[in-house]
Amino acid sequence: MKRNAHNQNVGSKVVRSDDRIDSTGEVFTPMELCMKMVSNIPQSVLENDKSTFLDNSAGSGNFLLALQAELCKYHKLSHINDNMLYAVELMPDNHAEMCKRLGVSVDHPHFVCADALNYDYSFGKPIGVEVYM
């Protein structure tokens, strides 16, 4: 469990064994680094209410939390969660923790528990050419 201490230090409450970390390759980005990444997003992109952001290996949601906090300077939280943020996370416990931290339900269509390599990225919306005909 020596590596689990790192995961707990980045804001997660999920206990992960070393075996789990070995088998899943889970690596969690510290909140300070997430905030630094978000600070590099141009203000015009953050202000644009049509901008969308995807984290396809969301873990417990640190990047999305940092982004959500920054977007709240320009938009209402409901608009951000329902129109701007999207996430895919493989592990059900990470997914549940991410949703709780973001203030959304686990069945919110923008925040899915799925394998990012096989997910269709529809987020509950119809996809394909026929949608635009």
Where are the regions that the model predicts?
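SAM-dependent methyltransferase catalytic region
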Residues: M1-M133
